[in-house]
From Swiss-Prot:
Its main location: membrane. It comes from Bos taurus. The gene is TMEM41A. The VTT domain was previously called the SNARE-assoc domain. As there is no evidence that this domain associates with SNARE proteins, it was renamed as VMP1, TMEM41, and TVP38 (VTT) domain. The chain crosses the membrane at residues 67-87, 90-110, 153-173, 175-195, 219-239. It is found in: Membrane. GO terms for cellular component: membrane. Residues 1-17 form the signal peptide. Keywords: Membrane, Signal, Transmembrane, Transmembrane helix. InterPro entries: TM41A/B (IPR045014), VTT_dom (IPR032816). The lineage of its organism: Eukaryota, Metazoa, Chordata, Craniata, Vertebrata. Belongs to the TMEM41 family. This is Transmembrane protein 41A.
Length: 264
């Protein structure tokens, strides 16, 4: 009960702080209406139309209030990640539209890692009992898999991020229960989600620069789409290669054990 109350207090305080940050907007002379310039709050996008509208508003704000937009974006991203709220993919796309493909990618990778670690810490302090109570079977299954791969835990965590057998938010919540070291957890998120973040950020960068259908078929856009395809395919190829190698090792060890039994 005390853990739940503490978590609710932290959540309420963070929500209120983000609310103040998104409603006390500085006025921007580049925005034409008073409604756009400060008499309305910003919002989390729920579809591509809202995402595009929000992107246009924030890009106008960024011309005069670059630091404020940066702070607002980081706060919103960490809020979603720390409290395991779905929808970070929209923020990744927004990062590409606001900050460009490479700065956006770097920012999303860092924020994803910090936010996931925040979720780890909140779960460690407030949520262990709640997670075990509501998801006992999932925790038990994941615990078994982690223990089976304890010797190569970091690479197993990378595998889970690249090809999640369980949702990322649940892995963030259950990691302290599974005794996953926080340093390994942080860097597995930082590295393992690079392909996913890259795809989302590049998508946002492309969408923000398209002004007509002709621009969709430009060489620059074609190279970006090719890069997205390669990043999506390479991790799967590498994981498949390492999985086959591991399978051969297992087969070899099984053969040795069978031969030793025949000898005895």
């Amino acid at each position: 009960m005390h853990s739940l109350l503490g978590l609710l207090l932290v959540f309420a305080g963070s929500t209120f702080a983000l609310y103040l940050l998104s409603t006390r907007l500085p006025r921007a002379s580049t925005l034409v209406s008073a409604e756009e310039s400060g008499d309305r709050s910003l919002w989390f996008p729920s579809d591509l139309a809202e995402l595009r509208e929000l992107s246009e508003v924030l890009r106008e704000y960024r011309k005069e209030h670059q630091v404020y937009v940066f702070l607002l974006f980081c706060s919103a991203y960490l809020y979603k990640q720390s409290f395991a709220i779905p929808g970070s993919s929209f923020l990744n796309v927004l990062a590409g539209a606001l900050f460009g493909p490479w700065l956006g990618l770097l920012l999303c990778c860092v924020l994803t890692s910090v936010g996931a670690t925040g979720c780890y810490l909140l779960s460690s302090v407030f949520g262990k009992q709640l997670v075990v109570f509501y998801f006992p079977d999932k925790v038990a299954l994941l615990q078994k898999k982690v223990e089976e791969n304890r010797n190569g835990l970091f690479f197993f965590l990378l595998f889970l991020r690249l090809f999640p057998m369980t949702p990322n938010w649940f892995l963030n919540l259950s990691a302290p229960i599974l005794n996953i070291p926080i340093v390994q957890f942080f860097f597995s998120v930082l590295i393992g989600l690079i392909p996913y973040n890259f795809i989302c950020v590049q998508t946002g960068s492309i969408l923000s620069t398209l002004t007509s259908l002709d621009a969709l078929f430009s060489w620059e856009t074609a190279f970006k789409l090719l890069a997205i395809a390669l990043v999506a395919l390479v991790p799967g190829t590498l994981i498949k290669k390492f999985s086959q190698k591991d399978l051969r090792l297992k087969e070899t060890s099984n053969t040795h054990s069978l031969n030793s039994r025949k000898v005895t």
